Amino acid sequence: MAAARASLGRIFPESSILFLCDMQEKLRDRVLYFPQIVSMAARMLKVARILDVPVLLTEHYPQGLGPTVPELGAQGVRTMSKTSFSMVPPLQQELDKLPQLKSVLLCGIETQVCILNTALDLLDRGLQVHVAVDACSSQSEMNRLVALARMQHSGVFLSTSEALTLQLIKDAAHPQFKEIQKILKEPVPEIGLLGFFQGMNNPLLPNSRP
C-alpha cells in the first residue's frame, strides 16, 4: 500500500526542494522559449520562497556560459557551479542535509542534458522527481520532446508550474493562498508543447498508438 501511495506523486512543502538548472546568459539566444521558461521558473521560485521550500541553483561552466540571468530573481539563492551534466554531484552535500526530502521540483535547461541526467540521478536516490514542463527547454525541439518522454518512461512526473503550486498549497484556505493567487493570475506564456501533448501518436499519452 505504501508503494501505491508513493506512485501518486503527492508533494508537500516540508519534504520538497526546488532545483533551478543552468539558466545562464550565454544560453539566452540559443535555447527555445528562453524568456518564457525563465519566467515560469521565476514563478516557481517565488512560490518556493513563500512556502519556505528550499531552493538550490546551478550554473554550468559559468566561465564560458556566464552567470544566471537576473530576471530569474535568484539573488540570494545558494548557487553551485558545475561541469557535470547533472545537478546532483555538486549538490550532494546539500541533499544529505535534508533527511526529510522526498520530492524534487525541477526547472531549467537543457531538457535532454542536465534536466534528464539530474532526474535520473535523483530517481537513483529514491526521490520523486517532478519536472515543470513549462519551465524547461532545449536548443532543439526534438531533443526537448524526446527527453520529456524518456523521463516519464523512467518514472518522472511531468507537470506544470501552476499544477505543482496548487499541489503544494492544497486548499484555498491556505494562509498564503491570496499571495500565491497573485502569481497564478499572471499571464501564462506559450511554450510550444500544446500540439505535442494533443498528438494522437504522442508517446506521453497512455492510449497512443501508431
From Swiss-Prot:
GO CC term, one of those recorded: cytoplasm
GO biological process: protein destabilization
Disulfide bonds: none
Extent of the signal sequence: none
Keyword Protease: no
Top-level taxon in the UniProt lineage: Eukaryota
List of residues that carry Phosphoserine: 7
InterPro entries: Isochorismatase-like_dom, Isochorismatase-like_sf, Isochorismatase_domain
Keywords: Cytoplasm, Nucleus, Phosphoprotein
Record-stated family: Belongs to the isochorismatase family.
The keyword Repeat is annotated on this UniProt entry: no
Subunit-level organization: Interacts with CDKN2A.
Name of this chain's protein: Isochorismatase domain-containing protein 2
Subcellular location as annotated: Cytoplasm; Nucleus
